[in-house]
Amino acid sequence: AEELFLKHGGHPHRDEENGIYCSTGSLGLGITVAVGRALANKNRKVHVLISDGESAEGSVWEALRFIKESNLPNIEVYVNVNGYAAYDKVDVKYLVDRLKVFLPTINIRYTSVNQYPFLRGLNAHYHVMSEQDYKSTL
């Protein structure tokens, strides 16, 4: 895990050699870029990973609706469902049910978020890890 973390970091960056053609920015941006790429080149399969937390963004729902209504066959959407957004928990059952209505072919992947003892409450989002904290996460 440490080797992969050191190689790729915590957020994907443009790395064409490994099939990552776009680095994303704001939440909801990745899926809209993926839809554009799928439209521009219908002979290639496009894969996009979104999260349950970012699914609160309107652009995500607009993109899902567009994929379904346009019958865009060359895009695969994967949702990392860990039950957390930036500052709060996500109602996973409600979200997954709603996602499947918008796009029945959506791929749901359930993951878990480790709860480390040094991360507590809303301030956890802004926690600066000590070296000891960092080593305990690997």
Predicted stretch roles:
Residues 41, 72, 101-103:
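Short, well-ordered coil/turn elements that cap or connect secondary structure elements
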Residues 69-98:
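A short, conserved beta-to-alpha structural element at the edge of catalytic cores
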Residues 59-61, 87-91, 117-122:
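Short acidic, glycine/serine/threonine-rich loops at helix termini
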Residues 46, 73-78, 105-106:
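Hydrophobic beta-strand segments of well-ordered beta-sheets in folded domains
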Residues 97-138:
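Glycine/aspartate-rich loop-and-adjacent alpha/beta segment that forms the canonical ThDP
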Residues 1-70:
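Cofactor-binding active-site loop characterized by glycine-rich and histidine/acidic residues
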Residues 25-30, 79-81, 129-138:
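Short, surface-exposed, charge-dense and proline/glycine-enriched linear segments
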Residues 38, 49-50, 78-80, 111:
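Short beta-strand segments
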